[in-house]
Amino acid sequence: MPRKGYVAKRDVLPDPMYNSKLVSRLINRLMIDGKRGTASTILYDAFDIIKEETGNEPLEVFEEAMNNIMPVLEVKARRIGGSNYQVPIEVRPERRTTLGLRWLVSYARLRGEHTMDQRLAREIMDAANNTGAAVKKREDTHKMADANRAFAHYRW
């Protein structure tokens, strides 16, 4: 933690093709070793695949997928009287988006398709249809929070 006070959060510039900050953040999440050009090519190719297969606007499909992935509740460990409790808490909007993007990219990387643009396109389409590994992760997170609802009074 910085001792000199609050560090201002830098604003992400929207991407040039879709003029969307969410797309720009996804490109940043896809990027490995600073190769933004490669990451944006992968994403735009994935969006082309989505447009071909669904016939819908890829940005709308992506936003629908993100709404289905982003968690509302999560659990946080809290130590009270020598015991660790998993306390359910609401997820802040910024963290919701961050978790959604992180889960989307990580589960897309684990898929079996040949290229990353195909994997990402499939994961986005699955998430838009409320299926897929990223949506399952959200459901598991919500189940965990629901199971530990008894400890909700330990919130801080």
Swiss-Prot record:
It comes from the Bacteria. Keywords: Ribonucleoprotein, Ribosomal protein, RNA-binding, rRNA-binding, tRNA-binding. One of its GO terms (biological process) is translation. The keyword rRNA-binding applies. One of the primary rRNA binding proteins, it binds directly to 16S rRNA where it nucleates assembly of the head domain of the 30S subunit. Is located at the subunit interface close to the decoding center, probably blocks exit of the E-site tRNA. Belongs to the universal ribosomal protein uS7 family. Part of the 30S ribosomal subunit. Contacts proteins S9 and S11. This is Small ribosomal subunit protein uS7. It comes from Latilactobacillus sakei subsp. sakei (strain 23K) (Lactobacillus sakei subsp. sakei). The gene is rpsG.
